[in-house]
């Protein structure tokens, strides 16, 4: 089946035959949540109370007994109507001394998605999926090699973040927390499975749920949110006008159309010049620096000449290059650039006035690093919870 997405007007492949996930309060506006409460014969403010338990205290249906401001007699109906279980953890894998955790989730219709929580000394970041699979077909990405199953709902996206916030708030590892004690989730990056801008409506609603204060959302800082895209130009321009100062990350991976057509197939539709023009418009409108994502592939896109070509495109722009040594996947024979090649690439960019750093890779051994989601991890370090 091919569907036209309302968010960008583009024809993108979707797989038919999947049921829609059940209604969840994270899918609903405040007025819609209140309407559900009144349809149950309850005062509208009961919906606000339930939403506070979810967004502020990260409570789930299993925690209904903790919602003591709700009369016990109404909890079952209210929870059933607006807090269905959308994601079930199938497997959780830890590495980096327990500071990185990948969770494999099963949706109610059996689709598989993954999220990754990473704890750093000064922050905690969760990488979330926006689709089950991906239809962009990038040959070095495990998700792209597997194809697209379906878009995620707003609530399915938000649930990944709420689970991460719940994990960070846990007091001990026995309660499901990470080593180091309780903390606060500070950053969300839409760099998991899927192309976020191909699921624009759900993405936009999810961003509002993450930013808006309780009882409408988690109250995270918009500046701690990053949306990654392979370059869906109409959607980039549309996002620029939404009034949300989130960071835009463009998965560029090549400075020229000939190579990028091979690495990022959507480039045949929106070439490098158009993608970067939209990115610079985004930076101008939002005042936010654009992150240019560039996977360093040995002998493919890591030559000094391509570093110079990339610098020529970016010099003078509000941009930062995030260089990512390619992470291995089973479907690709390409390898990461050698450390010396990485250093040379960075040095040539910086010498031409372009800010650039090499990403601190997390989770490679459990297939949780960039480009590895949906790849088979070589070591299983933790059973499902």
From Swiss-Prot:
Keyword annotations from UniProtKB, A to Z: 4Fe-4S, Cytoplasm, Disulfide bond, Iron, Iron-sulfur, Metal-binding, Methyltransferase, rRNA processing, S-adenosyl-L-methionine, Transferase, tRNA processing
Keyword Cytoplasm: yes
Binding site for S-adenosyl-L-methionine: 194-195, 228, 251-253, 327
GO biological process per UniProt: rRNA base methylation; tRNA methylation
Sites where the protein binds [4Fe-4S] cluster: 134, 138, 141
EC primary class: transferase
Enzyme active site: 114 (proton acceptor), 370 (s-methylcysteine intermediate)
A Gene Ontology molecular function term of the record: rRNA (adenine(2503)-C2-)-methyltransferase activity
Region annotated Disordered, chain positions: 1-24
Top-rank lineage group of the source organism: Bacteria
Co-factor binding comment: Binds 1 [4Fe-4S] cluster. The cluster is coordinated with 3 cysteines and an exchangeable S-adenosyl-L-methionine.
GO cellular component terms, A-Z: cytoplasm
Required cofactor names: [4Fe-4S] cluster
Localization per Swiss-Prot or TrEMBL: Cytoplasm
Disulfide bonds: 127-370
Domain Radical SAM core: 120-364
UniProt keyword annotation of Manganese present: no
Catalytic activity, as annotated: adenosine(2503) in 23S rRNA + 2 reduced [2Fe-2S]-[ferredoxin] + 2 S-adenosyl-L-methionine = 2-methyladenosine(2503) in 23S rRNA + 5'-deoxyadenosine + L-methionine + 2 oxidized [2Fe-2S]-[ferredoxin] + S-adenosyl-L-homocysteine; adenosine(37) in tRNA + 2 reduced [2Fe-2S]-[ferredoxin] + 2 S-adenosyl-L-methionine = 2-methyladenosine(37) in tRNA + 5'-deoxyadenosine + L-methionine + 2 oxidized [2Fe-2S]-[ferredoxin] + S-adenosyl-L-homocysteine
EC number(s) per entry: 2.1.1.192
Other observations noted: Reaction proceeds by a ping-pong mechanism involving intermediate methylation of a conserved cysteine residue.
Function: Specifically methylates position 2 of adenine 2503 in 23S rRNA and position 2 of adenine 37 in tRNAs.
Family indicated by similarity: Belongs to the radical SAM superfamily. RlmN family.
UniProt protein name: Probable dual-specificity RNA methyltransferase RlmN
Gene coding for it: rlmN
């Amino acid at each position: 089946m091919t569907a036209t997405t309302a968010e960008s007007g583009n024809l993108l492949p979707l797989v038919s035959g999947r049921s829609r996930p059940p209604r969840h309060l994270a899918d609903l506006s405040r007025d819609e949540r209140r309407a559900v409460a009144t349809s149950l014969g309850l005062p509208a403010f009961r919906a606000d109370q339930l939403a506070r338990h979810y967004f502020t205290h990260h409570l789930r249906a299993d925690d209904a007994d903790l919602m003591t401001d709700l009369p016990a007699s109404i909890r079952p109906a209210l929870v059933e109507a607006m807090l269905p279980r959308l994601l079930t953890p199938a497997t959780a894998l830890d590495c980096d001394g327990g500071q990185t955790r990948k969770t494999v989730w099963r949706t109610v219709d059996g689709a598989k998605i993954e999220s990754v929580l990473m704890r750093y000394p000064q922050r905690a970041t969760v990488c979330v999926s926006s689709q089950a699979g991906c239809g962009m077909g990038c040959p070095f990405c495990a998700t792209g090699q597997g194809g697209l199953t379906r878009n995620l709902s707003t609530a399915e996206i938000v649930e990944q973040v709420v689970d991460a916030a719940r994990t960070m708030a846990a007091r001990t590892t026995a309660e499901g927390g990470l080593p180091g004690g309780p903390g606060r989730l500070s950053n969300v990056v839409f760099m998991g499975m899927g192309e976020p801008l191909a699921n624009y409506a759900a993405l936009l609603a999810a961003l509002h749920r993450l930013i808006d204060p309780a009882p409408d959302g988690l109250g995270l800082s918009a500046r701690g949110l990053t949306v990654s895209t392979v370059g869906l130009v109409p959607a980039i321009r549309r996002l620029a006008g939404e009034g949300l100062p989130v960071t835009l990350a463009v998965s560029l991976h090549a400075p020229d159309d000939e190579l990028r057509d091979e690495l990022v197939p959507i480039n045949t539709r929106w070439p490098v010049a158009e993608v970067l023009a939209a990115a610079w418009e985004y930076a101008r409108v939002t005042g936010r620096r654009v992150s240019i994502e560039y996977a360093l592939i040995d002998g493919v896109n890591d030559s000094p000449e391509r570093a110079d070509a990339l610098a020529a495109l970016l010099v003078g722009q509000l941009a930062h290059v995030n260089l990512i040594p390619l992470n291995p996947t089973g479907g690709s024979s390409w390898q990461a650039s050698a450390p010396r090649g990485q250093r040379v690439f960075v040095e040539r960019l910086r010498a031409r006035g372009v800010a650039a750093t090499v990403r601190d890779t997390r989770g490679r051994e459990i297939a949780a690093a960039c480009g590895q989601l949906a790849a088979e991890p070589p070591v299983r370090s933790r059973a499902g919870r």
